[in-house]
Amino acid sequence: MLQPKNTKFRKMHKGKNRGLAIGTNVHFGLYGLKAITRGRLKSSQIESARRAITRAIKRQGKIWIRIFPDKPITKKPLEVRMGKGKGNVEYWVALVQPGKILYEISGVSEELSRIAFKLAAAKLPVKTMFVTKLVM
């Protein structure tokens, strides 16, 4: 699972997930998976999508993960009364805005990468689309 090695503070405010994304172009690979809705991706969801891509391309080519879960989400234990402070960190999420490139692939055919990204998109809670690198 992805999570930061160390952070300045253990817990974080809930905050908002507004605005447009940074990192909207395919930069490293030839094909990318772009988010078209906003949401929060858990580290487990990012990892399961990565596994789906790896299995689909049969360990050929190269994969880049362009998102990292850096926001801790806390949860209080079951049947605990309100108050007594904020709960413990339960999992880590990455905030995703529309237009953000989530994964990139190179070294495989476009047809195979479309299949791989379709399998990965089924594991993610945001709507996605397949994009190719713009060659100038």
Swiss-Prot record:
Assigned GO CC terms: cytosolic large ribosomal subunit
Molecular function, one GO term: rRNA binding
Domain of life: Bacteria
UniProt KW keywords: Ribonucleoprotein, Ribosomal protein, RNA-binding, rRNA-binding, tRNA-binding
Gene Ontology biological process terms in this record: translation
Pfam families assigned: Ribosomal_L16
NCBIfam families on file: rplP_bact (TIGR01164)
UniProt similarity note: Belongs to the universal ribosomal protein uL16 family.
Self-association state and partner proteins as the record states: Part of the 50S ribosomal subunit.
Function of the molecule: Binds 23S rRNA and is also seen to make contacts with the A and possibly P site tRNAs.
Name used for this protein in its record: Large ribosomal subunit protein uL16
Annotated source species: Buchnera aphidicola subsp. Baizongia pistaciae (strain Bp)
Classification of source organism: Bacteria, Pseudomonadati, Pseudomonadota, Gammaproteobacteria, Enterobacterales
Gene that encodes the chain: rplP
